[in-house]
C-alpha cells in the first residue's frame, strides 16, 4: 500500500489519499462502482455536519455530576477525524450521510472516553488547552463519567443501525475497542522498561491509535453497503494512517508550541512514556 506524503502533517487531506491508494497495483473496487449522480461531500462539509450533530447532543440527564463532564469533554472540540473518516467511507457508496451521524458520534464518544481515562492515568493537567476532567472535577468523577461514555458509545452505535449490518458493525467496533485497551496496557507496561524495541512500539501504537481509525473507515464502508474486500482495504489503509499520525504526535510532543498543541511539551517523555523518538535515542545511545 502507498500512503501519500501529503497525509503526514495534515488534518483532513484524507480523501485524495484514499482515492489514490491501490492494492497490488489495482484501484479499489468502489472506484468503478461510483454513481455519477451521487453527491460527494468535501471533508470540511462533513466536519461541519458532524460537529453540529455532536454539539446538539443533550446530556441533561440526572445525576448532573455524571453527565456534565461528558458534555464538557465532547465540547472541547478536536479534529473529529474518526467520525469524518466514517462519513467519508460511507460517502464512497452512498450520499445520505445523515443516516449514520449517530454511529459517527458514537465513535467520537468512545474516542473521547479513552482520552478522559488516558488523562487520568497519565495525571495530565491539560487537554486542548482546558483542564482535564479529573482536574476540573475529581478522579472518581472522571472514572465514572468515562464508564458512562463507554456504555453510551455502544448504545449509540447499535441504535438505528440497520439489522443486516448489526453483527458486522458490532464485531468491528468491539474488536477495535478492546484492542485500544490492549494498546493502553502495553503503553503502561513499557513505562517500566528501557529495552522496548521499535517493533514493539509500532505494535503498541497500532493497537492504541491505528485500530480505531481503521474501524472508522471499515464501519462507514459496511454501513454504506461496501463489499468485504473494499471494507478490509479501507481498514488496512486506516492502520497505516494511524501509524503516521502517532509518529507525528511523538514529534510534536517534543517540538510543538504548547499553545497550539494543547498539551504540555515533553509530557510523554517526562511521564516515562515510550515514544518513537525516545526509543530511537536510547538505541543510539547504547550503540545499537
What are these regions (language model features)?
Residues 1-16:
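Single conserved hydrophobic/aromatic residue that forms the stacking wall/gate
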Residues 17-19, 34:
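Short, positively charged and aromatic/hydrophobic N-terminal segments
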Residues 20-28:
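N-terminal amphipathic/hydrophobic targeting modules at extreme N-termini
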Residues 38-57:
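N-terminal amphipathic/basic leader segments beginning at the initiator methionine
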Residues 55-287:
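Mg2+-dependent prenyl diphosphate-binding active-site environment of isoprenoid biosynthetic enzymes
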Amino acid at each position: 500500500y502507498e500512503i501519500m506524503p501529503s497525509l503526514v502533517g495534515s488534518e483532513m487531506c484524507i480523501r485524495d489519499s484514499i482515492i489514490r491508494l491501490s492494492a497490488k497495483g489495482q484501484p479499489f473496487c468502489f472506484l468503478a462502482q461510483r454513481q455519477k449522480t451521487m453527491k460527494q461531500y468535501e471533508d470540511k462539509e462533513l466536519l461541519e455536519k458532524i460537529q453540529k450533530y455532536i454539539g446538539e447532543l443533550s446530556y441533561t440527564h440526572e445525576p448532573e455530576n455524571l453527565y456534565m463532564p461528558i458534555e464538557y469533554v465532547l465540547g472541547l472540540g478536536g479534529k473529529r477525524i474518526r467520525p469524518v473518516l466514517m462519513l467519508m467511507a460511507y460517502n464512497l457508496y452512498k450520499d445520505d450521510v445523515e443516516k449514520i451521524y449517530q454511529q459517527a458520534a458514537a465513535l467520537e464518544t468512545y474516542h473521547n472516553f479513552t482520552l478522559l481515562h488516558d488523562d487520568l492515568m497519565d495525571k495530565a493537567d491539560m487537554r486542548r488547552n482546558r483542564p482535564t476532567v479529573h482536574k476540573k472535577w475529581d478522579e472518581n468523577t472522571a472514572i465514572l463519567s468515562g464508564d458512562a461514555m463507554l456504555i453510551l458509545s455502544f448504545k449509540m452505535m447499535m441504535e438505528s443501525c440497520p439489522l443486516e449490518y448489526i453483527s458486522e458493525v458490532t464485531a468491528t467496533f468491539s474488536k477495535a475497542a478492546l484492542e485500544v485497551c490492549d494498546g493502553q496496557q502495553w503503553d503502561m507496561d513499557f513505562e517500566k522498561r528501557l529495552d522496548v524495541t521499535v517493533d514493539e512500539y509500532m505494535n503498541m501504537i497500532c493497537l492504541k491509535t491505528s485500530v480505531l481509525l481503521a474501524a472508522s473507515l471499515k464501519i462507514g464502508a459496511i454501513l454504506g453497503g461496501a463489499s468485504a474486500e473494499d471494507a478490509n482495504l479501507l481498514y488496512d489503509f486506516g492502520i497505516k494512517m494511524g501509524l503516521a499520525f502517532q509518529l507525528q504526535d511523538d514529534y510534536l510532543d517534543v517540538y510543538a508550541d504548547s499553545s497550539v498543541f494543547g498539551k504540555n511539551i515533553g509530557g510523554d517523555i517526562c511521564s516515562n512514556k515510550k515514544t518513537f523518538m525516545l526509543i530511537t535515542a536510547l538505541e543510539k545511545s547504547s550503540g545499537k
